[in-house]
Swiss-Prot record:
One of its GO terms (molecular function) is protein serine/threonine kinase inhibitor activity. GO terms for biological process: mitochondrion organization; negative regulation of PERK-mediated unfolded protein response. Its main location: mitochondrion. Residues 1-64 are annotated as: Disordered. Residues 1-242 are mitochondrial intermembrane. Its EC number is 3.6.1.-. Can form homooligomers. Homodimer formation at the N-terminus may be regulated by ATP and is required for the interaction with the inner surface of the mitochondrial outer membrane and correct mitochondrial homeostasis. The gene is atad3-a. This is ATPase family AAA domain-containing protein 3-A. It is a single-pass membrane protein. SUPFAM superfamilies: P-loop containing nucleoside triphosphate hydrolases.
Length: 593
């Protein structure tokens, strides 16, 4: 019933309980009316209105039919309040218990901190004591070292003093000995001079007698030799048979010396032309005596080897492959029928397979090949003409026929009218033109150049076939990537002898992707890319070539290729912007494929 007395005003009144009207205010209830000067008692401000309302409400509640429910509701509210108070008491007790636990935890934390601080103090004290002990030990060592150094210094001073005393003693002894020696020499010289002065007449007489005897001996020797040679020459002249035999012998000796000298030169030149290798030739398949002695097994295999396909290992575009195959067949048939060989000019960017095809062409035709570079001609100077004639003389002695491949031919076969070339190089060029003026059945001339427009017109007149080697296309690049990936990666990994393994990924798909990324690269650059993959595998810790390593090497090669192209463009070379452009299109229009 707390709500009757104004308690729990915030709570809602129970349903079913009628509201009680407020009683009217009694007259004069206000404390303001009346005389202000009258003394006030303690009940002067008491308002009985609340008691009246409570009494009235109690009477109405007793008379109401909901009285019992109201009483029960009041009891329930009182029990609820009691339970809330008990809950608050429990919460207070829990808070007190938590506070006690917190105090215990704080005390334990303080105790732990105290123990840690004591431990730190003990450690600091121990470290300080150890530091003091180390300092004392270091001071002792320092003092001991200083004492040892002082003792050593004293010993050195003592040794130096003893050495100085010994040196002074030796010097004094040597000085005394020198003085005694000088006195002795002086005494001997004086005695010798005295003796010579006393015996001067005797000495002069002895010298005079010796000179007279020597002069008499020389004169007698001259007379004896003249007599002997005179008698011999007189005897030789008087006998004409001896004179004739002597003249004939001297003549035969001179003829023999001259013949041996010239025969040796002729034999040397013959051996050099037949068995040796000219200085301008860098590489050749012809068998030399030195090579046969060094590598007999290799030479035997070469002699009994079968004829190879001209395009084995050479990857070209279908049109170019068809053309060079026709050239290979024609060359082979020319050799078989002992006809005249045709001269070929191969031009195009570097690394497109010109040198490789020349070697394969020689092997396919059963011919020997010899490779020379144009850059080796200019440094020879005056010897260039002789060296050039030696090359062609040597080429003419080949029984199987020789394919003479001149790489970088534009280095010395330049235009004589416009290019500034030396007289020696001009003479060498004239010798080359003289030896290639007519077609031969002994050798076949193959020129390779990156700038064929710089050739002398006489060189172009000696060319029978012009072949353009362009950069590989997408299909050719994919074949090249697969070829070198198999050669430098898969084959070494499958052999098991080398430290190289390949991770698991789709090799064919990767080769197709790389062929698209390597646009603009030559066959040589792609082959170097295969070598780079192999080197990357060897350089790794486990020797496994992963796909990421392949991509990294390809990206590096692409950057290097772009840098090279930028350098070519900066140098102003015409072939850098359009590297696949055909500079000899007017000449090729009239050439049958």
């Amino acid at each position: 019933m707390s709500w009757l007395f104004g308690l729990n005003k915030g709570q809602q009144e129970p349903p079913g309980v009628p509201g009680f009207p407020e009683p009217p205010s009694p007259p004069g209830g206000s404390g303001d009316g009346g005389d202000k000067n009258k003394p006030k008692d303690k009940w002067s401000n008491f308002d009985p209105t609340g008691l009246e309302r409570a009494a009235k409400a109690a009477r109405e509640l007793d008379q109401s039919r909901h009285a019992k429910e109201a009483i029960n509701l009041a009891k329930v509210q009182e029990e609820t309040l009691q339970m809330e108070q008990q809950a608050k008491i429990k919460e207070y007790e829990a808070a007190v218990e938590q506070l006690k636990n917190e105090q215990i935890r704080v005390q334990a934390e303080e105790r732990r901190k105290t123990l840690n601080e004591e431990t730190k103090q003990h450690q600091a004290r121990a470290q300080y004591q150890d530091k003091l002990a180390r300092q004392r030990y270091e001071d002792q060592l320092r003092q001991q070292q200083l004492q040892n150094e002082e003792n050593l210094r004293r010993q050195e001073d003592s040794v130096q003093k003893q050495e100085a005393m010994r040196r002074a003693t030796v010097e004094h002894e040597m000085e005394l000995r020198h003085k005694n020696e000088m006195l002795r020499i002086e005494a001997e010289a004086r005695a010798q001079a005295k003796v010579e002065r006393e015996n001067a007449d005797i000495i002069r007489e002895q010298i005079r007698l010796k000179a007279a005897e020597h002069r008499q001996t020389v004169l007698e020797s001259i007379k004896t030799a003249g007599t002997v040679f005179g008698e011999g020459f007189r005897t030789f002249i008087s006998d004409w048979d001896k004179v004739t035999a002597t003249v004939a012998g001297l003549t035969l000796l001179a003829v023999g010396v001259y013949t041996a000298k010239n025969a040796t030169g002729v034999a040397g030149r013959y051996i050099e032309a037949r068995l040796g290798k000219p200085s301008l030739v860098r590489d050749t398949s012809r068998i030399t005596v030195a090579e046969a002695v060094k590598h007999p097994i290799k030479i035997t295999k070469r002699l009994y080897s079968k004829i190879q396909d001209a395009l084995e290992g050479v990857i070209l575009s279908p049109r170019l492959e068809e053309r060079v195959r026709d050239i290979a067949i024609a060359t082979r048939n020319t050799k078989a029928n002992k006809g005249l060989y045709r001269n070929i000019l191969m031009y195009g960017p570097p690394g497109t397979g010109k040198t490789l095809f020349a070697k394969k062409l020689a092997m396919h035709s059963g011919m020997d090949y010899a490779i020379m570079t144009g850059g080796d001609v200019a440094p020879m100077g005056r010897e260039g003409v002789t060296a050039m004639h030696k090359v062609f003389d040597w080429a003419g002695t080949s029984k199987r026929g020789l394919l003479l491949f001149v790489d970088e031919a534009d280095a010395f076969l330049r235009k004589r009218s416009t290019e500034k070339i030396s007289e020696d190089l001009r003479a060498t060029l004239n010798a080359f033109l003289y030896r290639t003026g007519e077609q031969s059945n002994k050798f076949m001339l193959v020129l390779a150049s990156n700038q064929p427009e710089q050739f002398d017109w006489a060189i172009n007149d000696r060319i029978d076939e012009i072949v353009h080697f362009d950069l590989p296309g997408l299909e050719e690049r994919e074949r090249l990537v697969r070829l070198y990936f198999d050669k430098y990666v898969l084959q070494p990994a499958s052999e098991g002898k080398q430290r190289l393994k390949v991770a698991q990924f789709d090799y064919g798909k990767k080769c197709s992707e790389l062929s698209k990324l390597t646009e603009g690269m030559s066959g040589r650059e792609i082959s170097k890319l295969g070598v780079a993959w192999q080197a990357a595998a060897y350089a790794s810790e486990d020797g496994i070539l992963t796909e990421a390593m392949i991509d990294a090497r390809v990206a590096d090669a692409i950057r290097q290729h772009q840098q090279k192209m930028a350098w070519l463009k900066a140098e102003g070379k015409e072939g850098a912007k359009e590297i696949g452009k055909n500079p000899l299109q007017p000449l090729l229009e009239g050439t049958q494929v």
